[in-house]
Amino acid sequence: MRTWRIHELGDPIDQLTLDEVAEPELEPGRVLVEVDAVGLAFPDVLQCRGEYQVKPPLPYCPGSETAGRVSAVGDGVDQALVGQRVVALGGGLAERVVLPEGSVFT
């Protein structure tokens, strides 16, 4: 799966790399989203520079605003979400992303 990732802090234009990574693993309470679109905003830039209050461990995939379709859900998540178009928070600069159910909205 292709994903854009930050391996070192700095300006996104200099630090973003397109990586081939393993498919994300679905866990209980989580949702797999096939990403259709992602929004990058100023908080993403600050996070890439290490200047935002949330500091994910490196490497990480930015993209705080994600839109797509749910392709699978983990144990404990309503199966009715599968196939639904959603917006979600976090890690969206990838082909697919696994997120906590509470970060996905219909």
Place the predicted regions along the sequence by residue.
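NAD(P)H dinucleotide-binding glycine-rich loop of Rossmann-like/cofactor-binding domains
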Residues: 15, 46, 57, 79, ...
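Short beta-strand-to-turn element immediately C-terminal to the catalytic PLP-Schiff-base lysine
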Residues: 6, 48, 71-72, 98-99
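Glycine-rich beta-strand-centered segment in the early N-terminal region that forms part
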Residues: 22-40, 51-92
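Short N-terminal binding/cap micro-motifs at the start of the first secondary-structure element
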Residues: 10-18, 42-44
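Extreme N-terminal starter segment of soluble prokaryotic enzymes
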Residues: 1-2
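Pocket-edge structural micro-motifs
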Residues: 5-8, 35
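Active-site donor-binding loop signature of nucleotide-sugar glycosyltransferases
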Residues: 8, 23, 99-101
